[in-house]
């Protein structure tokens, strides 16, 4: 099992919660408790080496709010759902996004992930309706079609990196969903390859001394990024041009780009997006829409390989929902061979795959693809009795909150059955937030849920995975929570 930090107690947590904007004051600030060292940058080095372990230890030791410094930078870690809700929903205008996402401007321009203020709010009003569940259901067949092609390519008994496979399939799916049936196969492949290059580039920039990379243009990684960006720009702008020409000829499309091209902000009386705005939003959807889901699926398959009883119940549900019967396993009910003939899952099956949904939800609790959210205060801000000064960095970690025993008993145990309707109803809103929340929450959340459930059902319908015991599993928390060394799995075909 992958090693991870955990709370051993939550006795240090306070239940009080009060946040608000605060005025600047000349009085000496009272800081919350937190780790301090006489050695400069000691904590920063610990955070760079193992950020999740560091944040977990701080949360366990100091409770709902902790203060520490990275060099001269004041940092606050919030571990209370109410505090997080106040920042992400009620007082979001008091904060801007932290450096990690600003780095992405190199590719994304002023897309939803990187933009701020009124421009961000306007773009969100334009884009969010295009990603509503009722509109994205039409992409379900694309998801299962790519999954089937991948399953047919696999061979029984081989060992492969399932993380790489998930990156490739989610890249292909998002390319097809956004750019549609008119995209050529070589263009789709080009999008996937270029996205991988860009994702790796941004992850490198966020590593220690990553800012130095940009200052040496001749480095291969910089040249590779520029080539990938140029390729993506060429494909996206050409597709925008083609879609506009089709529109002028009254030829409609069913892809997301066509929907975005039609969208406008009726509330503000602002017309359609320009080519440049469309380009930025398409790039944002590309980058945000493949790696997070790929990581979530990778961790899901890993957890299933470690819990054969859960995997067996998953396969039984698949057979019941998609085959009108129960799995008749010749291997003693362990999810092995089955005589049940099953059909391909559809969007209409998603609500019926209840245990599949619980598995995906629990996987994202244990290994949230977006493992922390950072904000920078642009004004002084009050949390409980403490004033957070303008310029401070605020961290709100999904990983930390999702492993808090106050909200999840035995948080280090993979237990999909914890997700009862009653549990989901009574959990504080930001005790579980794999997709963020508020005005800056992930607009693609419905797409991700549908994609995750359909891919799990389609793949596990045909294959069982066994984790390579010789393969080391370790967390790699960069922009998203990746497996550091990939995820080696041996494939077993169901017959």
Model-derived features: where do they sit?
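Cytochrome P450 heme-binding "Cys pocket" and the immediately downstream C-terminal segment
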Residues: 308-310, 445-482
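Conserved cytochrome P450 K-helix E-x-x-R motif and the immediately C-terminal K′/meander segment
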Residues: 41-63, 234, 238, 342-384, ...
């Amino acid at each position: 099992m992958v090693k991870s930090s955990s709370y051993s107690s939550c006795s240090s947590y306070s239940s009080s919660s009060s946040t608000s904007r605060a005025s600047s004051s000349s009085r000496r600030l009272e800081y919350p408790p937190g780790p301090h060292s006489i050695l400069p940058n000691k904590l920063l080095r610990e955070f760079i080496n193992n950020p999740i372990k560091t944040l977990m230890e701080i949360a366990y030791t100091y409770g709902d709010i902790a203060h520490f410094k990275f060099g001269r930078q004041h940092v606050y870690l919030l571990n209370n759902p109410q505090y997080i809700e106040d920042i992400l929903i009620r007082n979001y205008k008091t904060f801007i996004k932290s450096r990690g996402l600003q780095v992405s401007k190199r590719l994304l321009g002023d897309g939803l992930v990187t933009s701020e203020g009124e421009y961000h709010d306007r773009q969100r009003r334009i884009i969010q309706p295009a990603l509503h569940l009722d509109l994205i259901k039409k992409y379900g067949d694309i998801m299962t079609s790519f999954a089937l092609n991948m399953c047919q390519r696999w061979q029984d008994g081989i060992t492969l990196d399932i993380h790489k496979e998930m990156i490739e399939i989610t890249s292909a799916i998002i390319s097809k969903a956004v750019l549609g049936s008119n995209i050529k196969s070589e263009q789709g492949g080009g999008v996937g390859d270029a996205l991988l290059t860009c994702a790796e580039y941004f992850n490198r920039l966020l590593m220690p001394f990553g800012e130095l990379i940009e200052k040496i243009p001749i480095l291969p990684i910089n040249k590779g990024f520029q080539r990938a960006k140029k390729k993506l720009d060429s494909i996206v702008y050409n597709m925008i041009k083609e879609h506009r020409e089709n529109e002028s000829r009254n030829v409609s499309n069913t892809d997301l780009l066509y929907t975005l091209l039609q969208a406008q902000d009726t509330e503000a009386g602002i017309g359609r997006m320009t080519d440049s705005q469309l380009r930025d939003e398409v790039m944002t959807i590309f980058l945000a829409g493949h790696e997070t889901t790929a990581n979530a699926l990778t961790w899901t398959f890993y957890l299933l390989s470690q819990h054969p009883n859960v995997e067996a119940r998953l396969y039984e549900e698949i057979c019941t929902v998609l085959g009108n019967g129960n799995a008749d396993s010749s291997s003693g009910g362990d999810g092995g061979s089955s005589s049940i003939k099953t059909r391909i899952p559809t969007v209409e099956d998603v609500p019926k795959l209840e245990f599949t949904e619980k598995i995906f939800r629990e996987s994202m609790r244990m290994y949230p693809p977006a493992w922390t959210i950072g904000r920078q205060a642009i004004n002084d801000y009050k949390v409980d009795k403490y004033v957070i000064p303008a310029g401070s960095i605020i961290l709100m970690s999904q990983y930390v909150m999702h492993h808090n025993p106050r909200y999840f008993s035995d948080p280090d145990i993979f237990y999909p059955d914890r997700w009862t309707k009653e549990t989901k109803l009574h959990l504080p809103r930001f005790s579980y937030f794999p997709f963020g929340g508020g005005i800056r929450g992930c607009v693609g959340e419905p797409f991700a849920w549908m994609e995750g459930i359909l891919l799990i059902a389609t793949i596990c319908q045909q294959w069982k995975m066994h984790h390579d015991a010789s393969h080391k599993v370790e967390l790699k928390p960069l922009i998203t929570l990746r497996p550091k060394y990939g995820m080696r799995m041996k494939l077993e075909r169901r017959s």
